[in-house]
Amino acid sequence: MTKMIPPVPTAAAAVMMPTPKQKIGFSIESIVGNDVSTAGGNSTPDLSGPQSPPPGERNVPGSPPQTPPATLTLIPGSPPHHLMAPPAHGLPYPHPHAQQQQQQHLQAPHPHPHLSPAQQHVLHQHLLMQHQHPGTPKSHQDIQELLQRLHHNAAMASGLSPLQTRLSPETEQPQMAVSLKRERSPAPPAMEQAENPAQRIQPPHTPPKSVSPQSSQPSSSPTLLISSPHATPPQQQQQQPPPNYPKPAMMHPGGAGPMMMPGMPPAGLVRPFPMGPGGPPMPQGQPGLPDIKALPPYINAPPELPPQHNPHLIAAAQFQMAAALQAGHVLGPAAAAAAAAGLPPHAAQFMPNPGMARDSYQLYPWLLSRHGRIFPHRFPGSFLVPPFRKPKRIRTAFSPSQLLKLEHAFESNQYVVGAERKALAQNLNLSETQVKVWFQNRRTKHKRMQQEDEKGGEGGSQRNMHNGSGDEDDDELIDMEMDECPSDEEHELDASH
């Protein structure tokens, strides 16, 4: 005889219970909870066919959870009545001695949940065949041998952990449910029905086996249903701890990872500029670290700053993007000088994402041209035109007719201003700025040609070469005044001569 061990429900008890067939019929007494005599067990309507067993047999593991009759008193250490074996000799309930023996079978060290679904199905068919032949009395030794054989096969087949599905609960949740459930006294089934209204209303519901095998657990078992949300009683919702869903990094104030947003770099790379008195304070310098003021504004941002503590994060990111697109009109002198020098060799360890700054240098090549320069506060970025504005300049292509009319206007008057310049621009389909810049370049070229003629004479090729070099200087001077217009039109004149 196996040693009696008090039943300790495990997580496998909620996983491995089979659901061989979905039974539809249930008795009104099991719903209402009225007193039912032990001889009146045949009141359940038989809706599952002629081969369906009586109600005493229907409550095997795998049937929908039903409430035992009120006259049956539950023993504190015993499983519910629908975990017991079918009754002998066609009686609705077995003999008390047979109950004790069957409890010993169920309280073996390896209970039913450790069997595979196929082995449990074999045991279920064996019990059904014995019940269909009431003339042959059932031998408990045969049942015990069958159980031992199945346990041995299950132990030899798989020494692994019990089957875990995607919807299976964590191992801590059944433990908590057991500790809260076992302290309750064995209340009558009517009180259990009042406490668990959800299971009383929906007893015949059995989800598919592939989704939630533990849904066939009985209503009075300590491990409750977990995978089916609509059959969960309110008491179980109070017992279950909140599920540990993966939370994003922005929900943890002390999290190590910065907040990632779709159209923005990480939070460690974005920091508003200290433009006004209401801006964030500058971080203090630490001994042994390089000077923070020497780094670009998106490198020296402290990565441990939580994003939710900075209410101006999104506005600062938009401001920095706009400042970068305006080619440095808003950058301060120290930040511009630091960005000009590029990344120092020791700056990679202070950057949360080193690849982001490299991509930003590719996006904004004007940062690379400000190498080692110091600029005063009051001058905008357009003061720095000569080093980096040349490659981006779009050259205005004048037509021969426009050049001819401009030359005639220059011969008559070298200074075209006011209404005359406006009329000439409208006549040539040009802007006033283009006309003004062309006249400035033409006057500069005329002066240089006069100076070279007075010096007595060098070749025309050398003169054109000097004029080209002088035009570059004039272009730089004029382009600082007229930023919106290109000023290389004089090269067209040199090509036309």
UniProtKB/Swiss-Prot annotation:
Residues 35-50, 161-176 have a biased composition (Polar residues). It comes from the Eukaryota. One of its GO terms (biological process) is anterior head segmentation. The keyword Thylakoid does not apply. Keywords: Developmental protein, DNA-binding, Homeobox, Nucleus. GO terms for molecular function: DNA-binding transcription factor activity, RNA polymerase II-specific; RNA polymerase II cis-regulatory region sequence-specific DNA binding; RNA polymerase II transcription regulatory region sequence-specific DNA binding. Residues 470-497 have a biased composition (Acidic residues). One of its GO terms (cellular component) is nucleus. It is found in: Nucleus. Pfam families: Homeodomain (PF00046). Residues 96-117, 208-239, 248-262 have a biased composition (Low complexity). Residues 34-117, 161-262, 441-497 are annotated as: Disordered. Gene3D superfamilies: Homeodomain-like. The sequence shown is that of strain canton S. Belongs to the EMX homeobox family. This is Homeotic protein empty spiracles. It comes from Drosophila melanogaster (Fruit fly). The gene is ems.
